[in-house]
Amino acid sequence: MEIVHVCIQALSHYIFSTTEKNIRNEVVLITGSGRGLGQQMAILFAKRGAIVVLCDSPDIGNSETLELISSINNEKRVHAYTCDIGNRVEVKLLVERIQTEVGNITMLVNNATVLTSNSILDMSEDEFSRSLNANLFSAYWLIRQILPSMMRRNHGHIITMLGSTAVFGLGNFSAVCTAKSGLVGLMESIDHELTLGGYDGIYTTAAVSHYLTTHLFQLSKTCFNPVIPPLTLDYAAKKIMHAILINRKFVCVPRLYYLIPFVKGILPARAFLIILNTLVNPKIPIYTQHELSSKHNLTSSTQHIPRKRSHMSACQ
């Protein structure tokens, strides 16, 4: 009966939504806040009265985001730090510094992502390892540092941005897909541990979004576009923010992405690969690195453009 009650409650929660919680004076750490979705999320948090802590790599910085938020809130309510989140020592020092200068972090947004696009054979072991450090282990290190203070007060919220590579493996993105799939398991495991420990005041949210109209994806041209065009930053950020504010554990933007695990579950594996080949893989990569400006370079120094393949050869 308890399971039925929870299912009904979840369905009602999904259909009718609930009142958004008040996050004024919450200390929110956002990684990858210098641009893109991280910047947009930081602005939305600031508009709701949160104390926003910005974190990005030294080569990107937070100057633009800091300026935008300072025009919304008092400068004392926004703080900017630089950190290589792929470095465990730097992450540890960052959290200690924030706790000393700002206060205990009550909301963590794991948003930073380092994209690498190469086939698994063309990617070096060092590149693969660096990608996992930045995209997977950074979230683990941050949660390990921040979660104890949340548990002492039974209050907090951990948010992780996943992207579409968390729900299906995409060719030439093996490092990112590995990291994002790992984050799914990490978030589910943490949520279970919190439930077992009786920490009902600490929430988790995992957000999956379609690719966005940012510098990384502005040249994207896949067969998905007529059905699901690239999302604007404003639209994606507002949808994810609403899910956070009603404590939703998992959110997909757009909702069509909820169907992907179901489709993968009922279709033969080769059939799902044919769908991927038809809509994504054969002709054009998700983004074209060599056409981006130098300041937007990714971790991988070269862009691997997959050759056109037949459906059968790709599946065998």
Residue map of PLM features:
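Substrate-binding pocket helix/loop in short-chain dehydrogenase/reductase
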Residues: 119-120, 127-129
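Active-site helix of classical SDR
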Residues: 143, 179
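Conserved glycine-rich Rossmann-like NAD(P)H-binding loop of the short-chain dehydrogenase/reductase
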Residues: 48-64
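Canonical Rossmann dinucleotide-binding motif of NAD(H)/NADP(H)-dependent dehydrogenases/reductases
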Residues: 13-53
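Non-catalytic terminal and boundary segments that flank Rossmann-like NAD(P)-dependent oxidoreductase
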Residues: 1-25, 274-316
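SDR active-site lid
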Residues: 193-257
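The beta1-alpha1 cofactor-binding region of Rossmann-like NAD(H)/NADP(H)-dependent oxidoreductases
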Residues: 59-60, 81-93, 125
